[in-house]
């Protein structure tokens, strides 16, 4: 029988990226933080729900902070130093997610609000009666 050459397990070399973008989608129910390179390829992501918060606790600023910290720490393997932040949505996790990324050690170059605003498009949902 022919002997199969054994392949030694090689550690995958991660590409080094100096500048990146952080996309924060803050809805009323959840917060999604995605860190990408300049071309938009995702390096890491985290959500409030995936960080262990369920139900109404998903939509808190603290849950958004934890999600942003997790995404930021995971993206540090790529050598990121500077982040450009894009915030979308009206949720309660907008501010705290940006502060958490700053606390992880990233230099935030600029913050842009990319919340989609309709030019009188679809009819909005009716008001809640509690």
From Swiss-Prot:
The entry describes its oligomerization and partners as: Part of the 30S ribosomal subunit. Interacts with proteins S7 and S18. Binds to IF-3.
Gene Ontology molecular function terms on file = rRNA binding; structural constituent of ribosome
Q: Which HAMAP family match?
A: Ribosomal_uS11 (MF_01310)
What NCBIfam families does the annotation carry? PRK05309.1, uS11_bact
Which keywords does UniProt give here? Ribonucleoprotein, Ribosomal protein, RNA-binding, rRNA-binding
Q: What does this protein do?
A: Located on the platform of the 30S subunit, it bridges several disparate RNA helices of the 16S rRNA. Forms part of the Shine-Dalgarno cleft in the 70S ribosome.
Q: Which family does it belong to?
A: Belongs to the universal ribosomal protein uS11 family.
Alphabetical list of InterPro entries matching this protein: Ribosomal_uS11 (IPR001971), Ribosomal_uS11_bac-type (IPR019981), Ribosomal_uS11_CS (IPR018102), Ribosomal_uS11_sf (IPR036967)
Give the protein's recorded name. Small ribosomal subunit protein uS11
- Identify the GO cellular component terms for this protein: ribonucleoprotein complex; ribosome
Provide the coiled-coil residue spans.
Answer: none
Lineage top rank: taxon: Bacteria
Kindly state a single biological-process term from the GO annotations of this entry.
translation
Instruction: State the Pfam families in the record.
Output: Ribosomal_S11 (PF00411)
């Amino acid at each position: 029988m022919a002997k199969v050459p054994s392949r030694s397990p090689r550690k995958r070399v991660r590409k080094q990226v100096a500048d990146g973008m952080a996309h924060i989608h803050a809805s009323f129910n959840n917060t999604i933080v995605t860190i990408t390179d300049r071309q938009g390829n995702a390096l890491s992501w985290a959500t409030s729900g995936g960080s262990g918060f369920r139900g109404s606790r998903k939509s808190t600023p603290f849950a958004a902070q934890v999600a942003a910290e997790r995404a930021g720490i995971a993206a540090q393997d790529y050598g990121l130093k500077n982040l450009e932040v894009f915030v979308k949505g009206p949720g309660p996790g907008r501010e705290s997610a940006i502060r958490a990324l700053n606390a992880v050690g990233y230099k935030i170059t600029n913050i842009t609000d990319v919340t989609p605003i309709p030019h009188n498009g679809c009819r909005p949902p009716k008001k809640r009666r509690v």
